[in-house]
Structure formats: structure tokens, C-alpha cells
């Protein structure tokens, strides 16, 4: 059999990214966030409490990926009800938004939607976290915010991931004095200061020394301590009153910061923000029920449609079988083409809900599988139907069987690059998830046909796919999700396939290199060590164009419940910085 090369050197690393307990477990993208959640569980909190604590902590330790100036989506499983709730706290477009707001002389200007004031959508994270704690949790919000506030106050040493993100976002961060002071260090300062030695004021580097220090700021080296005292104060304020983010002096400061950089966000936009309760999307895969997020995410529909179409091809193939990989790519290509059609905010795009139902139907699964031939279909021959990140993830299962899969984001690395002075709040650049014009691509290369244009109060389309898998007996098996923009459905699908079809240990299921295709560009993205030479040749012989990724895409976090013992096994992507924890 032609298969996939898997370096033996990776196996010992996998073993350090798993934790198990008979009671509860949590997996997040950062050890400090996992420990914050585990601490809440130890203190008697439930899965919702732990997820909220982890989300606030991630806002501190991974500001490039998520924060209280962003938004997200979450599935919450309440065991006593045997019900999955879908909470939408996605950002929305300000009331002054227009379909052509990112066009100049009729052409899209990408920088307008990816950095600065116009890129800022109305944040939903604080309202979403507060609602989750109120509806599903057991602890006061102030208790859930406190671990994050302490991390912000004391500071956290940054890792290589932070350094690389700051390097990528450097031009944007340098445009905002507050963001540059908080997240960068002066040229000539000790950018690699030992933890605890850096940090003047609210997280800036040590005072400059010498003439060379007068230049522009640069990304700190791993080990530098990020201190965010303003954010600590803001978090404690929100713990007492989360509505302070949306009304009053703090809301006016948030709006003023965006408008000072050319944005249209207003205090009235913040006051008008509301979360949405959605109905989860449901599908099936080899005797398991799969729940994921509906529009305004297209990720859940792509994930379920992909799994069901693969099952329609017959019994599970051998691990990394070349014919299976070919089918995976061909089906995913077609699903992403359908995404470009009617998908958008269901409150503004009437066809979005129907498109999601069709994409997750058994009939479409059979049709897509039947369309897979022996050779690759060029993307140009796969048309969308007529139209009518950088992110982070938390998975938790508690002792009562409650579970949360929560994905949160500020969109691109460090969002808009705008920090609200005196608050530590980094604002999102979620407006780039809209289409600047029909047929134009966003930062992830995704195109649309008109249903996802900006409009007042509209939620941008997303790929976030918080997911839960239930066994044939109805019991929870898996809670998982991932960041990664357009690659999220692929990442989550590989996690499900590796657990359900191949019975892999959870850490190996998440750490096995992945492939991805999103219709346009017409390439198969392959992670490092993703395919052996024989498999590459076989796929290329079918007409696929392979593109080697420089690094793994996605950063999945999952908790699995052992059907036989009930033990909770948590795992983090072993090639990243996350670590799971147990109470």
C-alpha cells in the first residue's frame, strides 16, 4: 500500500501532549490557559465555567489569536438535557458599513480590511463569554476572569509562536503607538530578556539604552515577558459588569480608538450588539452522530458534508490510502466551491440555512462521491451553485458529562493592530472575512459570489467548526475544534477520521500531518512530512498539484471520552505550544 511517511522522531513528542482523568479534562492552545480551566474545575466549576476561564486566559497569553476585542462560536453540551446548544458571538459589521467600503476606484484594497480602523467589526467575545457563564455555568463571572487578570498583571513569557506572529504583523502593529508599545520592543533593547526582567510600564520593553534604541520597535524574542496591566484592570471591570464593554465610558473609548484610525465603529454599534442562539448542524459518520456549527460558519457544513461523502464511498480505507486521499481532495474541492455560493449570515442571506442543509444531506453526499473519478477535476470545472486565522480553540468535558467546544478569534495575527489606549483591548480585523466584492479573495484565499458582502449588523462568514461526536449509543465521544482559517474543516475532519476509522490515540490523531484543498487556489496543501514519495507520485499522476506547506496548519484541541471506562483524555496538537490539563 502506498502510504504516508511518519517520522519516528515525532512519536516521543506526541506523548507529552496528552492528559487523562476519570473526572474531567481540558485542552487549549496554551498551557497557562489549560491550567486556568483546570483550576476552575478543581474549585467545583463545570465545563462552561472552565471554557470561559480558558477563553479569557487565551486572550492574555495568545493576544495574536483571540481576545476580548474579537468573537467566536461555541457548542455547549448539557448532559442533563442531552442537548447541544450553539452560541454565536461572532462579530458584526458596524451600522455605517457598505458593500463597497473596501473598494477604491472599483478595485479591492486589501489593506483596508486587514489593518486599521475600517477592519474592525463589533466585538462579541465579552457578551458571549458572559452569556455562556450565566446560562450554562455555576460560578460568578468575576471568578472566571480572575486567572486571566492575574496572568496579565504578572506577565507571561512569550514563545516562538508569538515571535513569528509579531513578525508577520509587524507593519500593522507599527502603525498603532499603543499596540507597538505593548507587543513590540525598541530596537536596541534586550529583546530576549529573561522572563521577569523585561517590561516597563504596561508590558513595554526595558527603557531604551543608547542611540540605536530610538528606531522602530521589533518583535521580542522568545522568553520576553509580556505584561498587560491595563488589560488586567479591564478584565476585572468586566468580571463585575460585562455590559461595561458595550455601554458607557469604556464603550466610547473602544469606538473612539477605531474611528481615530479611520473606522466607522460607534458606541451605538456596541450597545446594539446581541449574541445569537443557533440550531446545531447534525450529520452522521459510520454510526456516529456529528454536531457542528451552522451559518454564519460554513466550516461545520463542509466538515459534515465531507465526512458523509467519504462514508458514501464504502468501508474505511487503510490509513492514508492514496485512493482515499484523492477522494478527500475531490470532495473537499466541491464543498468549498459550494461555500462560495449562498453561504453568509443567515439573518441577512436567506439562502444560507438552506445551503447548509443541502450540504449536509445524504443525497448530496452520494452525488459528490459519485462525481469522484480517477483523475483530479480542475477547480475551473467546479463552479459554485447560483447565489440566492488565526484563531484559537478550547475543548472541555467535565465530571457530569457536560462539554464545550469553543473557537474564538481576532481573525488575522493581532487583528486590526489597534489597542484601545489605557485598556489593553486589542481590536479584531474581522471585516476581512467579508467579501470585498464578488469573486475576490480574502486573506485566506476564499472567494464568494455576493451573499457575504458587508452590510450593517451583518456577521461575516466563518470557517470555525467547533464539533462534537456522539457514539451509536448517544453518549459523547469527542469534543474538538481548531484554528486555521479556511483549513479548519480539514483539520477537524482528519481528527474525526483518525479516531473513528483508525482508532488512533488522541494525540496521534491530532498530530498526524494533514492535507487540504479549498477549491481556489487549485492546489493540495501538504503539511511537512505529510506524504511519502510514492503517495505524492500517485496523486500527481491523477492530476493533483501538490504544494508543500512551510508549517503545520491548524492547532486542534480535543477531549475524548473512553466508551468503556468513561475516562476523559485530552490532547493538544503536538507540533504546537498547547498542553492539556486535568483537575
Model-derived segments and spans:
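Extended C-terminal subregions enriched in glycine
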Residues: 345, 458-459, 492, 501-551
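Noncatalytic scaffold domains of N-terminal-nucleophile
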Residues: 17-35, 39, 47-240, 245-247, ...
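Internal maturation/activation junctions in enzymes
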Residues: 187, 209, 314-410, 422-423, ...
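Short, small/polar residue-rich loop motifs at catalytic or cofactor-binding pockets
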Residues: 277, 388-391, 413, 462-464, ...
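Glycine-rich phosphate/pyrophosphate-binding beta-alpha loops
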Residues: 291-300, 391, 395, 407-418, ...
Amino acid at each position: 500500500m502506498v502510504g504516508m511517511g511518519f517520522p519516528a522522531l515525532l512519536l516521543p513528542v506526541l506523548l507529552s501532549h496528552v492528559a487523562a482523568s476519570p473526572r474531567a479534562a481540558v485542552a487549549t492552545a496554551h498551557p497557562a490557559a489549560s491550567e486556568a480551566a483546570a483550576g476552575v474545575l478543581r474549585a467545583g466549576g463545570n465545563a462552561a465555567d472552565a471554557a470561559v476561564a480558558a477563553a479569557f486566559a487565551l486572550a492574555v497569553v495568545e493576544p495574536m489569536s483571540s481576545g476580548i476585542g474579537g468573537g467566536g462560536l461555541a457548542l455547549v453540551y448539557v448532559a442533563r438535557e442531552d442537548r447541544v446548544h450553539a452560541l454565536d458571538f461572532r462579530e458584526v459589521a458596524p451600522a455605517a458599513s457598505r458593500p463597497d467600503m473596501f473598494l477604491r476606484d472599483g478595485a479591492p484594497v486589501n489593506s483596508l480590511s486587514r489593518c486599521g480602523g475600517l477592519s474592525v467589526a463589533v466585538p462579541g467575545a465579552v457578551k458571549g463569554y458572559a452569556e455562556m457563564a450565566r446560562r450554562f455555568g455555576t460560578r460568578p463571572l468575576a471568578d472566571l476572569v480572575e486567572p486571566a487578570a492575574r496572568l496579565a498583571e504578572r506577565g507571561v513569557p512569550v514563545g516562538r509562536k508569538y515571535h513569528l506572529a509579531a513578525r508577520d504583523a509587524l507593519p500593522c502593529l507599527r502603525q498603532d503607538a499603543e499596540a507597538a508599545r505593548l507587543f513590540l520592543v525598541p530596537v536596541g533593547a534586550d529583546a530576549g530578556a529573561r522572563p521577569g526582567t523585561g517590561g516597563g510600564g504596561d508590558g513595554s520593553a526595558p527603557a531604551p539604552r543608547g542611540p540605536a534604541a530610538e528606531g522602530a520597535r521589533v518583535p521580542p524574542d522568545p522568553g520576553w515577558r509580556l505584561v498587560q496591566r491595563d488589560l488586567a484592570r479591564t478584565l476585572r471591570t468586566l468580571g463585575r459588569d460585562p455590559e461595561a464593554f458595550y455601554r458607557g465610558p469604556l464603550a466610547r473609548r473602544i469606538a473612539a480608538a477605531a474611528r481615530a484610525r479611520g473606522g466607522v465603529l460607534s458606541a451605538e454599534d456596541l450597545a446594539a450588539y446581541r449574541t445569537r442562539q443557533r440550531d446545531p448542524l447534525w450529520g452522521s459518520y459510520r454510526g456516529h452522530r456529528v454536531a457542528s456549527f451552522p451559518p454564519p460558519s460554513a466550516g461545520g457544513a463542509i466538515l459534515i458534508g465531507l465526512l458523509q461523502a467519504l462514508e458514501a464511498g464504502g468501508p474505511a480505507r487503510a490509513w492514508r490510502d492514496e485512493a482515499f486521499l484523492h477522494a478527500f481532495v475531490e470532495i473537499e474541492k466541491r464543498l468549498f466551491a459550494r461555500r462560495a455560493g449562498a453561504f453568509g449570515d443567515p439573518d441577512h442571506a436567506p439562502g444560507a440555512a438552506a445551503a447548509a442543509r443541502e450540504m449536509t444531506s445524504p443525497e448530496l453526499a452520494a452525488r459528490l462521491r459519485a462525481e469522484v473519478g480517477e483523475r483530479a477535476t480542475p477547480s475551473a470545472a467546479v463552479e459554485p451553485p447560483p447565489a440566492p486565522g488565526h484563531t484559537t480553540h478550547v475543548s472541555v468535558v467535565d465530571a457530569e458529562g457536560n462539554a464545550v467546544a469553543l473557537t474564538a478569534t481576532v481573525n488575522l495575527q493581532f487583528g486590526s493592530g489597534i489597542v484601545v489606549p489605557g485598556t489593553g483591548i486589542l481590536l479584531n480585523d474581522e471585516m476581512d472575512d467579508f467579501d470585498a466584492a464578488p469573486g475576490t479573495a480574502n486573506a485566506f484565499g476564499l472567494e464568494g459570489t455576493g451573499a457575504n458582502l458587508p452590510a450593517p449588523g451583518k456577521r461575516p462568514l466563518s470557517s470555525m467548526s467547533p464539533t462534537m461526536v456522539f457514539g451509536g449509543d448517544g453518549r459523547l465521544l469527542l469534543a474538538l475544534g481548531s484554528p486555521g482559517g479556511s483549513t479548519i474543516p480539514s483539520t477537524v475532519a482528519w481528527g474525526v477520521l483518525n479516531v473513528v476509522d483508525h482508532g488512533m490515540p488522541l494525540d496521534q490523531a491530532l498530530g498526524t500531518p494533514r492535507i487540504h484543498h479549498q477549491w481556489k487556489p487549485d492546489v493540495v496543501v501538504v503539511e511537512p512530512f505529510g506524504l511519502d514519495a510514492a503517495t505524492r507520485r500517485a496523486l500527481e499522476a491523477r492530476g493533483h498539484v501538490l504544494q508543500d506547506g512551510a508549517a503545520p496548519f491548524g492547532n486542534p484541541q480535543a477531549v475524548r471520552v473512553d466508551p468503556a471506562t468513561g475516562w476523559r483524555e485530552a490532547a493538544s496538537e503536538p507540533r504546537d505550544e498547547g498542553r492539556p490539563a486535568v483537575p
